[in-house]
Each structure stands twice: as structure tokens, then as C-alpha cells.
Amino acid sequence: MSATPPIAPIATPKVGFVSLGCPKALVDSEQIITQLRAEGYEISGTYDGADLVVVNTCGFIDEAVQESLDAIGEALNENGKVIVTGCLGAKKSASGSGLIEEVHPKVLAVTGPHALGEVMQHVHMHLPKPHDPFVDLVPAAGVKLTPRHYAYLKISEGCNHRCTFCIIPSMRGDLVSRPVADVMLEAENLFKSGVKELLVISQDTSAYGVDVKYRTGFWNGKPIKTRMTDLVGALGELAAQYGAWVRLHYVYPYPSVDEVIPMMAEGPFKGHVLPYLDVPFQHAHPEVLKRMKRPANAEKVMERVKKWREMCPDLTIRSTFIAGFPGETEEQFQTLLDFIREAELDRVGCFAYSPVEGATANELDGALPDEVREERRARFMEVAEEVSAKRIAKKVGKTLKVLVDEINADGGIGRTAADAPEIDGVVYIAPAVKASKRYKVGDFVSVKITGADGHDLWGEV
């Protein structure tokens, strides 16, 4: 009996790498190579031994531009499969098009600097990752603890504010924004995995990019500023491709928020960038806000809320507040109640102030007794629930788009664009009578609203 011929080993994919430019570009190269090695690629020392070549360019002076263009041309001649990254990737020609694409139209892809995520995306597209039986057990979207149809997308870590009641900066540090390409890659992987709703979170979503001076990143060859407005636009465009939702949380009431509201109200992203803002106002009286060291204490918050509603009548505003903060007088608390009535906030949470170890608010004079703090919280919620009930009642008779979260013996439970998971209300959906109207978890369905209480809705498909 003849011996079975040995199975030839599968060749490990090889990537050639050319690094040009300054030490900052060198660090970018190191990060890309580190990621390539971590994913199982070999780094080839020659063009002809590589399956493709990555060229990290410099575009600072004319000599560097020419050197980079020459290196790209050499890589194309010697290998033929070239991905270009670095500063020259962001440079335009005299005609306004990309300089590299104009000179070397056969390159596979071009990115700007600091584009690890986008470079890896293009490498994966043209040279799939080597199979690893252990790593491949982990989905591209990562392991999630949420249901499959929605996920949280964290865009930054830390916070630059020093609110007196909060100790987050001491635990998580100052603001560090994630590179925009990394955020977009994660969002795309989540949508590809079946996620229908992305909930954008951070400690301060409005401040995204402040720490990097709104540096321009690149995604799929397009420049995107590391800035909330630009990121929301890019996420909205991506969500539209997958018929999905994007919901914004922890948005401080800065003027820049005015730029996001139109995306919710009109244009190609309407219905994808949800008309929903989670804005942690915390209080409404200027003296209390000053003691809290809230960053929005100088903003004309009520005027801004009214402007947002004029721009987007369907806007849902959720917020959280603190009742019984040290030094809060009854008059100041009444100002807060008046604000809730006038602003007509849709969803509201309130906490009775509680000292947190390490918070500077502990040093403030005027600490209130526990019973006063709790009594004010209860009065606050009574007013807030009255306002919420009036706004919710207006939805009865309307047909709303609902994302189904759960199926049970009584039908389904879902959420409208006005409701974030866990913290807002739900829609109780009657069982579908017709087979054509049956739904499952993760489906979007049109629901005719037939009833409401102060928090939730009831309806039928």
C-alpha cells in the first residue's frame, strides 16, 4: 500500500514594509507592523518575497514627497500590490484629487497618517488573515454582553472636566479620544455582525477629539475629523448602508451639538442618526451649577433646548439631575422644577445627592439632611413623570418604527427611536395575527400605538 503524500503546509502570508519620514511616522510603522505580527502575518524583507507591500510615506517637504512617490513606484514595479499610508496620503494634487492616486493609480488603497485601523482593513481585504483556530473563535465584532441586535460603541475614555461630585477623572484620567478609523472599523464590524442599533458612549461625547485638536483621520480613503459632528455623520452614513440606528449618549450641551441636530431632522441620515440626545444637565440653577463646576453653567441651556426642538420637532431629550446638592436652597430647587416643566424633557432620572469618597463636593458647606435630599428627589420625579406622561400620550394613534428586543407569550417588547435600552420605556407589542406580520428579536416593525401610561406604550403591528 502506498504511503499518503504529506500535506503541504499553508504558506504564511507575507507583507513587505517600507517606512519613510520622521520619528512620528516611524512609530506609526511600528504600530502597524506590531499588529501585522500579532495577527500572524510575516514581515518580508524583500518586495518579491511579499504578497503585498505597505509604504508609509512622508509629505513634509518636496524632497520627501518625491522620495515617497519613488518608493511607491518601485514597490509597484517590483511587487504590484501596494497599500500606501502616511502624511502623503492626505496630500492633494493641483487638480484637487489625491496626489498619490493621480501619480500611481494602480495602488490598492491610500490612507492618511495615524491610520492603523484603516491600514489593517485594507490588508485584510487584499490578503486575508492566516487561520488561527484559537483567535478565529473570537468574532470580528468582539465578544459582547448585550443582545446581538444592539451594542455600545465607546469613542473615548476619561474626562477633562472636574465636576465636584464626580471622581471619574481620578480613576480614568483625562480625555483620550479613540482614532476615528478605529471607531469606524469597530462600528462596521458590529453592523456586519447583525447589530441594528449602536449606542455611542463616552464620559463626554461632545468633547470627542479635543485632546488631539480634532486631528483628521481616514476611513476608506476619506478624511474624517476626530470631532463629534464629523464622526456622527460618518456613523450615520454607515448605519444607512445597513438600515441601522445610531443613538447618542452623554452629550454635553455645547454649541457644537447644534451641528448634529440637522442630521437627525433631515437629509440622508434621518432615521439612522436618531432624534435622541442624552444630555446630563444635572441642575438648572446657575449657583448650583457653579458649585458643581459643571462645564455648561454659562450656557443658555433653555434657549438651546428650544432651538433644538425647533430644528427637530421629533427630538427626544433624556437627562439626569441631582437633587439636594450641598447648599441647594428651596428657591434654587424650585428653579430646577420650573426648568423641567418648561423644557418638557421626555425622559428624566434623578438622584438624591450622596457623598462620594474622594469628591471635592464633600468639602462644600451646606450639606443637607438625608430626608431633605430624598424628599426633593421624590418631588422632582413627580413633576418629571407628569411632563413625561403628557409627551408620551401624544404618541397614541401614531404608527412608530420599533426595534424588537424580546418575544414572549404575550407578544413582543421593543423600543422606539425615543427609547434607549435599560433606561427608557418600552413598547408592548400584541402578537401578530397574520403570518406576514410575524416578527423576531432584532426586527424593525411598524407598530400602531394604541395605549400609553406614564412610561411605556402599547401597540400592534
From Swiss-Prot:
Gene Ontology CC terms: cytosol
TRAM domain residues: 393-461
Family per record: Belongs to the methylthiotransferase family. RimO subfamily.
Claim: S-adenosyl-L-methionine is one of the keywords in the record: yes
Domain MTTase N-terminal: 13-128
Functional description taken from the UniProt entry: Catalyzes the methylthiolation of an aspartic acid residue of ribosomal protein uS12.
Entry cofactors: [4Fe-4S] cluster
InterPro entries given in the database record: Elp3/MiaA/NifB-like_rSAM, Methylthiotransferase, Methylthiotransferase_CS, Methylthiotransferase_N, Methylthiotransferase_N_sf, NA-bd_OB-fold, Ribosomal_uS12_MeSTrfase_RimO, rSAM
This enzyme's EC code(s): 2.8.4.4
Keyword Iron-sulfur: yes
Keyword terms: 4Fe-4S, Cytoplasm, Iron, Iron-sulfur, Metal-binding, S-adenosyl-L-methionine, Transferase
Species annotation: Paraburkholderia xenovorans (strain LB400)
Chain sites annotated for binding [4Fe-4S] cluster 1: C22, C58, C87
One Pfam entry name: Radical_SAM
Domain Radical SAM core: 145-390
Designated name of the protein: Ribosomal protein uS12 methylthiotransferase RimO
